[in-house]
């Protein structure tokens, strides 16, 4: 079945082992928590079409193995990503401490303009928390990241994290800050927008898109 | 907590959990499996008789042409651990180092290693009832000990994700921690190139070697991947890292296929991995070539590790020695050298 969408964004999910990257992706795509899951070896892949600010956007999401040594294998997949979820586990300081290294990888290997949202996952395990909200939000501010605490278990803020990242990219396209036509932007026009581009302007108003905010 | 809906009771003809503790998937095709099994049982019976005779003989398990032929046709389950230990050299190592495994576990601890292993314990074979926390006995403890001992024994490698599946699988087959440890040592220390070390250079090299072999033997597939800028890492790194465990779906029917692959791996070495990979790709060449984009290519490479072709292990194992054509160790060694040099130059 052919899907129509205005844009396609390449996304990454990165962060240390055991932070719940694959569970976040699974929750976002399947709308449920993956109870019995294997860890990711190498790179996995998922996609979903979302509606953001009246535009349909296909998110092509690359989920990566978190163990340090796999970075040398997965890095090749960073190239041309438009957005990233940078994930740590709020109950593990160690996963928080390695954020800077992951961020450097994303900005040098994907694109300096990559839109990154920091996700403090396992929000449902608040009693075991080792990283405060305040501390992480300061880190996010200093590094110009968006920030949410998420729970792949309950689904809290999972959808929001992906949508927020997508919305920011769309805004940057609108403002001209991001150019989808630039090589390696991680953004492609979909069939829908190509059709619109080919059609005379008057035809564009026929089917207004519902607002998905 | 929400869980995936379960289907109603399985048909009376089959058990929901196989003899190794793996839960069968909801869409398990009992009829097709029974049909395959009734034919395969005859093969197994014949092989079992021949193996009993071989093992009773004086020549035993020296690596002769007869033993190689026998192993390619499948080692009966009851002899599997013994044969793997003998042909891989693990048995000799174990006998030369009595008590070594236990001493490793009593020795100095390494908290970082322990933490890395702990992260993956509940993520190893989650679909196997014996690896669940509530199982009695729970194999997570054995798994943890084998991985820990190995990381202490070979600190250059430590623990790499993927080793958990291999160790877990060895524990299921040998039912012995110590034997699993020495077999893991045979695989990581001798049989496989450096797949699991921090630089994973052996893994990256072998992925490139496979790419080169596909370029020569199946140029259309290579052109498809190259054309879409798909790196072979994406589609095959799991095949190499997990040695087809957890790739070819692990219920008993396909488990047989993985066991049969490992029979040859322990006896003939890492070349077997290329034979299996090339056979899977060649068999499904037309199907792979239908792919129109990167996600589609990934999906097709996932699908080719499923279905009747891989379930029918006896035919599958015959095909890995005929389908890919000639594949000499000289070729592999030469390709490994050139790919490794190219990778080192890129750094």
Swiss-Prot record, chain A:
Example GO molecular function: GTPase activity
Q: Which GO terms describe its biological process?
A: D-glucose import; early endosome to Golgi transport; endosomal vesicle fusion; protein transport; Rab protein signal transduction; regulation of endocytosis; vesicle-mediated transport
Residues modified to N-acetylalanine: 2
User: Mind telling me how this protein is modified after translation?
Assistant: Serotonylation of Gln-67 by TGM2 during activation and aggregation of platelets leads to constitutive activation of GTPase activity.
| Keywords in alphabetical order | Acetylation, Cell membrane, Endosome, GTP-binding, Hydrolase, Lipoprotein, Magnesium, Membrane, Metal-binding, Methylation, Nucleotide-binding, Phosphoprotein, Prenylation, Protein transport, Transport
Where does the record place it? Answer: Cell membrane; Early endosome membrane
Reaction(s) catalyzed by this protein?
A: GTP + H2O = GDP + phosphate + H(+)
> What positions does the entry give for GDP binding?
18-23, 121-122, 124, 152-153
Residues modified as 5-glutamyl serotonin are 67
Enzyme group, top EC level?
Answer: hydrolase
Q: Where does Mg(2+) bind?
A: 22, 40, 63
- UniProt membrane topology term: Lipid-anchor
Membrane among keywords: yes
Q: Which InterPro entries match?
A: P-loop_NTPase (IPR027417), Rab4 (IPR041819), Rab_GTPases_membrane_traffic (IPR050209), Small_GTP-bd (IPR005225), Small_GTPase (IPR001806)
So which cofactors does this thing need?
Mg(2+)
The UniProt annotation puts motif Switch 1 at 39-44
Q: A cellular component term (GO) from this record?
A: early endosome membrane
Q: Which residues carry this modification: Phosphoserine?
A: 185, 193
**Which residues hold GTP?**
18-23, 37, 39-40, 66, 121-122, 124, 152-153
**Function statement:** The small GTPases Rab are key regulators of intracellular membrane trafficking, from the formation of transport vesicles to their fusion with membranes. Rabs cycle between an inactive GDP-bound form and an active GTP-bound form that is able to recruit to membranes different set of downstream effectors directly responsible for vesicle formation, movement, tethering and fusion. RAB4B mediates endosomal tethering and fusion through the interaction with RUFY1 and RAB14. Acts as a regulator of platelet alpha-granule release during activation and aggregation of platelets.
What's the family? Belongs to the small GTPase superfamily. Rab family.
Subunit notes for this chain? Interacts (GTP-bound form) with RUFY1; the interaction allows endosomal tethering and fusion.
Q: What is this protein called?
A: Ras-related protein Rab-4B
- Organism lineage: Eukaryota, Metazoa, Chordata, Craniata, Vertebrata
Q: Which gene encodes it?
A: RAB4B
């Amino acid at each position: 079945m052919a899907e129509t969408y205005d844009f396609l964004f390449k996304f990454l999910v990165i962060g240390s082992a055991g932070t719940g990257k694959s569970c976040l992706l699974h929750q976002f795509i399947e709308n449920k928590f993956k109870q019995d899951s294997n860890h990711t070896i190498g790179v996995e892949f998922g996609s979903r079409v979302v509606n953001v600010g009246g535009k349909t956007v296909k998110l092509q999401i690359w989920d990566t193995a978190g163990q340090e040594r796999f970075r040398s294998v997965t890095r090749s997949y960073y190239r041309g990503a438009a957005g990233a979820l940078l994930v740590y586990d709020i109950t593990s300081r160690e996963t928080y401490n390695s954020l800077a290294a992951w961020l450097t990888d994303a900005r040098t290997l994907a694109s300096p303009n990559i839109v990154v949202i920091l996700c403090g996952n396992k929000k449902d395990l608040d009693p075991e928390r080792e990283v405060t909200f305040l501390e992480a939000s300061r880190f996010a501010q200093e590094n110009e990241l968006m920030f949410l605490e998420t729970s792949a278990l309950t689904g809290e803020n999972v959808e929001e994290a992906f949508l927020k990242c997508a919305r920011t990219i769309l805004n940057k396209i609108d403002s001209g800050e991001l150019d989808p036509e630039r090589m390696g932007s991680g953004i492609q026009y979909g069939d829908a927008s190509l059709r619109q581009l080919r059609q005379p302007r008057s035809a564009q108003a026929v089917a207004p898109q519902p607002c998905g905010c | 907590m929400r869980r995936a809906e379960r289907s109603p009771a399985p048909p009376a003809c089959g058990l929901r959990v196989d003899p190794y503790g793996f839960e069968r998937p909801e869409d398990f095709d009992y009829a097709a499996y029974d049909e395959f099994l009734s034919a395969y049982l005859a093969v197994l019976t014949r092989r079992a008789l021949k193996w009993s005779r071989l093992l009773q003989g004086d020549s035993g398990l020296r690596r002769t042409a007869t033993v190689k032929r026998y192993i390619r046709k499948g080692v009966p389950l009851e002899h599997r651990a013994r044969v793997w230990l003998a042909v891989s050299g693990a048995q000799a190592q174990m006998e030369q180092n009595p008590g070594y495994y236990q001493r490793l576990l009593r020795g100095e601890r390494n908290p970082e290693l322990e933490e890395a292993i702990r992260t993956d314990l509940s993520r190893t074979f989650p679909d196997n009832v014996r690896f669940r926390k509530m199982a009695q006995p729970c194999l997570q403890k054995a798994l943890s000990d084998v991985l820990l001992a190995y990381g202490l024994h070979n600190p250059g490698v430590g623990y790499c994700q993927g080793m958990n599946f291999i160790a877990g699988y060895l524990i299921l087959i040998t039912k012995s921690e110590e034997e699993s440890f020495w077999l893991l040592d045979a695989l990581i220390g001798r049989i496989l190139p450096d797949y699991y070390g921090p630089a994973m250079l052996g893994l990256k090299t072998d992925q490139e070697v496979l790419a080169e072999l596909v370029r020569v033997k199946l140029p259309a597939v290579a052109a498809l991947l190259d054309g879409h800028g798909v790196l072979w890492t994406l589609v095959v790194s799991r095949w190499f890292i997990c040695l087809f465990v957890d790739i070819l779906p692990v219920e008993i029917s396909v488990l047989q296929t993985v066991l049969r692959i490992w029979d040859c791996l322990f006896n003939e070495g890492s070349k077997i991995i290329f034979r299996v990979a090339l056979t899977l790709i060649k068999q499904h060449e037309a199907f792979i070539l239908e792919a129109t984009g990167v996600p589609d290519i990934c999906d097709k490479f996932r699908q080719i590790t499923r279905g009747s072709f891989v379930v029918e292990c006896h035919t599958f194992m015959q095909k890995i020695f005929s389908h890919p054509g000639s594949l000499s160790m000289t070729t592999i060694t030469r390709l490994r050298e050139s790919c490794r040099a190219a990778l080192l130059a890129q750094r």
